[in-house]
């Protein structure tokens, strides 16, 4: 059995930019494109009720290899551009499960 990979990414948006960032991801179809990728088991964003600029992304992949392919897609290139525009900081955590 392959090891699944779960990633937790804590984004801190630039002040007042959280909603704009999420709106761009949605209207440009980036979230839907990621969810349709081979190997993507789960991909969703959660909002902090305590910090108006904080976002938590949780994503799960069938394998680390499929997640690495995901990072090389055109929509991920666009996501990186949007992060440069709207995000002040991002912290990544990984969990591998057999």
Where are these regions (language model features)?
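Generic structural motif
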Residues: 14-16, 97
């Amino acid at each position: 059995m392959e090891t699944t990979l779960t990633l937790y990414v804590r984004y801190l948006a630039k002040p007042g930019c959280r909603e704009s960032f999420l709106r761009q991801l949605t209207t440009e179809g980036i979230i839907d494109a990621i969810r349709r990728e081979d190997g993507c088991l789960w991909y969703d964003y959660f909002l902090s009720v305590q910090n108006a600029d904080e976002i938590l992304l949780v994503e799960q992949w069938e394998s680390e290899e499929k997640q690495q392919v995901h990072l090389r897609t055109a929509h991920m290139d666009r996501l990186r551009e949007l992060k440069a525009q709207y995000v002040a900081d991002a912290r990544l955590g990984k969990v591998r499960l057999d």
